[in-house]
């Protein structure tokens, strides 16, 4: 069963332009390098007024839990995680199944 994996990222300081570019480059490489996801999006809040310090959001979808677990173990994801740790990032993750109880509006 398909699922969504959503992660919010809070950094203790504003990222430099180079760091933002690094983050985007890493995540942009995943569809080809990792390949397991069916959707991948990365963005920032429009105003920052309500995000409580979580300045970036990663949205991914996977066909099943096994694919998500394989993604988590992939070296490209581990490198990204290490990059986050080096910057003392506080992630907030949420995973849920996409089923008749959670999909309230079909695409």
Give residue spans per PLM region.
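N-terminal nucleotide/polyanion-binding subdomain common to many enzyme families
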Residues: 81
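Nudix hydrolase/Nudix homology domain
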Residues: 84-86, 94
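Short S/T/G/P-rich N-terminal loop/turn motif that feeds into the first structured element of a domain
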Residues: 1-54, 63-73, 89, 96-107
